[in-house]
Swiss-Prot record:
The modification Serine amide is found at residue 84. It comes from Centruroides noxius (Mexican scorpion). Belongs to the long (4 C-C) scorpion toxin superfamily. Sodium channel inhibitor family. Beta subfamily. PROSITE patterns: LCN_CSAB. Its main location: secreted. Pfam families: Toxin_3. GO terms for molecular function: sodium channel inhibitor activity; toxin activity. Residues 20-84 form the LCN-type CS-alpha/beta domain. The keyword Transferase does not apply. This is Toxin Cn1. Has the structural arrangement of an alpha-helix connected to antiparallel beta-sheets by disulfide bonds (CS-alpha/beta). Beta toxins bind voltage-independently at site-4 of sodium channels (Nav) and shift the voltage of activation toward more negative potentials thereby affecting sodium channel activation and promoting spontaneous and repetitive firing. Keywords: Amidation, Disulfide bond, Ion channel impairing toxin, Neurotoxin, Secreted, Signal, Toxin, Voltage-gated sodium channel impairing toxin.
């Protein structure tokens, strides 16, 4: 019984450690812009939206960077898509 509990705990930790990080993108494939570097309420709110599943967001390099995103959330750079809307 203890072994099963330990294995389950390991899977939970692995899922947490392997969460996706990256810059959020807009509809054109560009990074979501931000101007207040560091702790940023806008980025944190955008990252933590339910459909994105992020755990924390902040402004880094004038783009919203998120930690703990779900695998289905697209992050910059998008393959085969430039930041021009084409």
């Amino acid at each position: 019984m203890n072994s099963l509990l330990m294995i389950t705990a390991c899977f939970v930790l692995i899922g947490t450690v392997w969460a996706k990080d990256g810059y959020l993108v807009d509809a054109k494939g560009c990074k979501k812009n931000c101007y207040k570097l560091g702790k940023n309420d806008y980025c944190n709110r955008e990252c933590r939206m339910k459909h994105r599943g992020g755990s924390y967001g902040y402004c880094y390099g004038f783009g919203c960077y998120c930690e703990g995103l779900s695998d289905s959330t697209p992050t910059w750079p998008l393959p085969n898509k430039t930041c021009s809307g084409k």
